[in-house]
Amino acid sequence: MLVYQDLLTGDELLSDSYPYKEIENGMLWEVEGKWVTKGVVEVDIGANASAEGGEDEGVDDTAVKVVDIVDVFRLQEQPAFDKKQFLGFVKRYIKLLTPKLDAEKQELFKKHIEGATKYLLCKLKDLQFFVGESMHDDGSLVFAYYKDGAADPTFLYFAYALKEIKC
């Protein structure tokens, strides 16, 4: 199994259990999340409750709906950014991430980050913002939004900020 960690913080953000599609010249990974129900326990004892007059006997079903990626990787939602805040984040992020990349990736990153930033700016009002479990200020952001008519969110990751780890 492969796990993808944030290159800046070491937080686990994704695994190969979630297929991704590269967009914006490979700068962003697009990953489909799913709403799942967590905490549901179904017990089938083979009895016919309606025939025996039994109803739910006060079992406290603490089931909650969560997005799989958010739950599994313990992503923490952050307040939304306005355009000025987002551009400030991107500038700081470029300064932090660039030295961590090898020379070839640095060139590609510098060449394509503007296109990825414009892509995200176009969706800014629809984005939810997440950080890794450590909630470190200098970490990568993970973005989520809903495609037209979709019931499940789509996540966007900065591809160059992910470090592949074999488990």
Curated annotation (Swiss-Prot):
Residues annotated as domain TCTP: 1-167
Main location group: cytoplasm
Molecular function (Gene Ontology), one example: calcium ion binding
Subcellular location: Cytoplasm
Superkingdom as given in the UniProt entry: Eukaryota
Coiled coil: none
GO cellular component: cytoplasm
SUPFAM superfamilies: Mss4-like (SSF51316)
InterPro entries attached to this UniProt entry: Mss4-like_sf (IPR011057), Mss4/transl-control_tumour (IPR011323), TCTP (IPR034737), Translation_control_tumour_CS (IPR018103), Translational_control_tumour_p (IPR018105)
Record-linked Pfam families: TCTP (PF00838)
Keywords: Calcium, Cytoplasm
PROSITE patterns: TCTP_1, TCTP_2, TCTP_3
Parts of the chain that traverse the membrane: none
Family: Belongs to the TCTP family.
UniProt xrefs under PANTHER family: TRANSLATIONALLY CONTROLLED TUMOR PROTEIN-RELATED
Protein task: Involved in calcium binding and microtubule stabilization.
Protein name: Translationally-controlled tumor protein homolog
